[in-house]
């Protein structure tokens, strides 16, 4: 039997140009399984070593390149390797872990096309080239927020590395099969590419389309996050389908923190593999059954209606011009998914009692527009039906009105009280979640994971 070797895709370029972005996007579009290996793992010393006073990371002699070649060769030939990981958060090396080869090995770093031995191991060579102004902006953003550097340290590192970049990194460009360039444009950061062979065009076209789709996705997430009446804290989730695959926000993440590679997951249609961290939203199953684009929110004014005994009657009245379904309260996650799967496919709006709103459409822009319209109608209804003004000290809710107030009570107590106040002032009857409902929520593994992620996000917010 012929020995089938794995593909190695080498991605090279200066520091902070988007090599990791390209690597992670490739894992999403390649049909066969792919893993990313970071060239930074080859650094000889930890961050605090005095050796870095004499060398830069761009100097080949400061990296274990011969060991890199041996490990790449093993992965190419289906041999497991043990590899330590350079942790940029700590500046130290994490303990070595075993890595099993897959069909596509994406090797990204500073020296991946440095010499003939690397280039001979490589099946596709990619060089990432970025406008200097953009490169500095990206490097500042990454190193300040993720790697713990000061602004002064970042600029000093850029200055110190200039000569080594010209000597060791830039010459690799001429050996690449593909050159990808990021640059500023009127519509934001654009990605362009040049290739020596037409055989890569299909892959590059998918890569470019996914990058543009992710930019739109991030933009919508950030815009929704600014609508405080639609989502609060880590509530709500958004998704869009790309070539049948699902791009969805992560569990416990704040929409304002979603990025091209952060707080979102890519779920492959072929094998269900999930690319990205943290795990996808627990409502992923519902998103899969809905149309191309989905926005799930917890609009406060709408919740004041949905958390009342009169919810169904009012929803039928004020949203009679919409194609919608009303679902009585069911546990988030799998139970909601089962109901969504059975819905009337003509319905593009789902009202979930004591929970929130799903809007699905052909585009995220359309979803957002409909979501705003629905929230506006709820706001108008409450305004027109206000019966009394409650004393500020007397509107503490007598129970939990929606799931997030149960799972994350500390950060949602004020919202729960505000919803209760609006219900009473509108002459409606509050519908609290039962103790049984609350116990089920607190025992869901998906909710436990979300609590963990929310706690982690809170810690990060405090540090910054």
What do these predicted regions represent?
Residues 94-145:
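ATP-dependent NMP and nucleoside kinases share a basic, alpha-helical "lid"
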Residues 19:
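Conserved lysine of the Walker
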Residues 1-3, 100, 163-208:
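NTP-dependent small-molecule kinase module
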Residues 35, 44-90, 104:
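Conserved nucleotide-sensing/catalytic segment adjacent to the nucleotide-binding pocket
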Residues 22, 26:
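Hydrophobic positions on the alpha1 helix immediately C-terminal to the Walker A/P-loop
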Residues 204-464:
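Glycine-rich flexible loops
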Residues 15:
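The conserved Walker
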């Amino acid at each position: 039997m012929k020995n089938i070797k794995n593909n190695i895709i080498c991605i090279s370029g200066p520091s902070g140009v988007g090599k990791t972005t390209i690597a992670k996007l490739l894992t999403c579009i390649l049909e066969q399984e792919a893993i990313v290996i970071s060239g930074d793992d080859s650094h000889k010393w930890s961050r605090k070593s005095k050796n870095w006073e004499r060398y830069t990371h761009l100097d080949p002699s400061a990296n274990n390149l011969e060991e890199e070649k041996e490990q790449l060769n093993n992965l190419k030939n289906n041999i497991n390797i043990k590899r330590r990981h350079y942790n940029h958060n700590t500046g130290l090396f994490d303990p070595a872990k075993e890595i099993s080869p897959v069909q596509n090995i994406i090797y990204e770093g500073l020296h991946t096309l440095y010499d003939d031995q690397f280039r001979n191991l490589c099946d596709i060579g990619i060089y990432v080239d970025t406008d200097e102004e953009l490169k500095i902006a990206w490097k500042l953003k990454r190193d300040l927020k993720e790697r713990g550097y000061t602004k002064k340290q970042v600029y000093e590192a850029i200055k110190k590395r200039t000569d080594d970049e010209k000597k060791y990194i830039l010459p690799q460009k001429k050996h690449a099969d593909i050159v990808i360039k990021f640059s500023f444009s009127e519509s934001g950061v654009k990605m362009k590419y040049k290739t020596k062979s037409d055989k890569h065009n299909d892959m590059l076209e998918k890569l470019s389309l996914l990058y543009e789709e992710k930019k739109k996705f991030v933009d919508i997430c950030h815009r929704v996050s600014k609508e405080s009446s639609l989502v609060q804290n880590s509530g709500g989730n958004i998704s869009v389908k790309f070539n049948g695959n699902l791009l969805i926000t992560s569990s416990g993440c704040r929409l304002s923190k979603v990025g091209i590679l952060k707080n979102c997951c890519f779920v492959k249609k072929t094998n269900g593999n999930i690319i990205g961290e943290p795990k996808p939203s627990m409502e992923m199953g519902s998103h899969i059954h809905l149309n191309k684009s989905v926005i799930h929110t917890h609009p406060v004014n709408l919740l004041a209606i949905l958390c009342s005994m009169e919810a169904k009657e009012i929803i039928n009245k004020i949203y009679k011009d919409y194609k919608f379904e009303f679902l009585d309260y069911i546990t988030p996650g799998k139970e909601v998914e089962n109901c969504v799967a059975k819905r009337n496919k003509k319905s593009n709006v789902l009202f979930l009692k004591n929970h929130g709103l799903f809007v699905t459409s052909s585009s995220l822009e359309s979803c957002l527009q409909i979501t705003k319209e629905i929230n506006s109608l709820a706001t108008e209804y409450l305004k027109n039906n206000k019966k009394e003004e409650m004393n500020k000290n007397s509107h503490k809710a007598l129970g939990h009105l929606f799931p997030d107030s149960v799972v994350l009570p500390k950060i949602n107590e004020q919202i729960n009280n505000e919803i209760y106040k609006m219900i009473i002032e509108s002459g409606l009857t509050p519908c609290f979640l039962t103790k049984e409902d609350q116990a089920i929520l607190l025992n869901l593994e998906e909710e436990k994971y979300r609590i963990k992620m929310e706690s982690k996000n809170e810690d990060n917010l405090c540090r910054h």
